[in-house]
A protein has these predicted regions:
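N-terminal chloroplast transit peptides
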Residues: 1-36
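Conserved loop->alpha-helix
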Residues: 37-259
Length: 259
């Protein structure tokens, strides 16, 4: 796994429409694969839940971002050669840690399009993307693949703002402040967390401020977009699911017994 190691959106309103929506983890079509269109073979209408490892495979470039209305957009990405070999319409790809469904494939074999629903635009940093900007990507894991990071679902819980970056000779320390402070209870020192789809190890946690830090090694900075992030930038955060279950179970147990 990667070693331990643009503005924030703490509001619960939709970033492009100003409409309030209830917060929930984002899953942009990874459960149901319906009405796929464009070039290429189609998958069955329902496919198993996608799984990712948190090991970012590389960077893709935004070729276009179309706002089809105030609650729906289409994102087209350009990928390195052969990245999309064997991919089908309906396949799942993690883009900055957000599970998206391929809805179109380019004739050149290096581009794919994804539809972004209102919840994705509100809850992630994808709605702020500009043409030419780079994003992290990971194709869904297959049976037999090594889980070198930790299990990542692609369901983004919130965004976080970069509030501090400290470079040393061989490492970079990055401090994040989560947009939803209630989630900081699930962020534990030495625990896993997904940051823009990267499986990282948490360093220190400041629960009062809703902050945590990670340390990034040179390879992580080279392969992912985290190497280009600066103070004020935003990232997508996915809490590690087992940690969330354990914390919630303990809290419920103690509450039932009046502890």
């Amino acid at each position: 796994m990667f070693a331990s190691s643009s503005s924030s959106s703490s509001s619960s309103t939709f970033a492009r429409g100003g409409v309030a929506f209830k917060k929930r983890a984002v899953d942009d079509g990874c459960r149901a694969k319906t009405n796929a269109f464009g070039r290429g073979r189609r998958r069955p209408s329902v496919s198993p839940r996608a799984l990712f490892t948190g090991l970012v495979q590389g960077k893709a470039t935004v070729r276009s971002f179309e706002n089809l209305d105030d609650q729906f957009a289409r994102l087209t990405l350009g990928f390195p050669e052969r990245t999309l070999d064997g991919i089908l319409i309906g396949a799942s790809v993690a883009v900055n840690g957000t599970c998206l469904t391929v809805t179109r494939l380019g004739e050149d074999g290096t581009s794919a399009s994804f539809d972004l629903i209102v919840e994705t635009l509100r809850a992630t940093n994808l709605g702020r993307l500009e043409v030419g900007e780079e994003v992290n990507y990971e194709r869904s894991a297959r049976v037999g693949d090594e889980i070198g990071g930790h299990t990542v679902s692609g369901h983004v819980h919130c965004t976080a703002e970069i509030v501090e970056v400290v470079d040393t000779e061989l490492n970079r320390k990055v401090v994040f402040e989560v947009s939803d402070k209630k989630l900081i209870k699930y962020v534990l020192p030495k625990g896993f967390i997904s940051v823009d789809g990267c499986s990282l190890t948490v360093g220190e946690v400041d629960k009062e401020k809703g902050r945590f830090n990670v340390w990034l090694i040179p390879e992580t900075l080279r392969v992912t977009v985290l190497g280009d992030k600066v103070v004020g930038g935003t990232v997508n955060i996915e809490i590690e699911s087992q940690t969330q279950v354990i914390v919630d179970t303990i809290e419920r147990y103690m509450a039932e017994r009046g502890l």
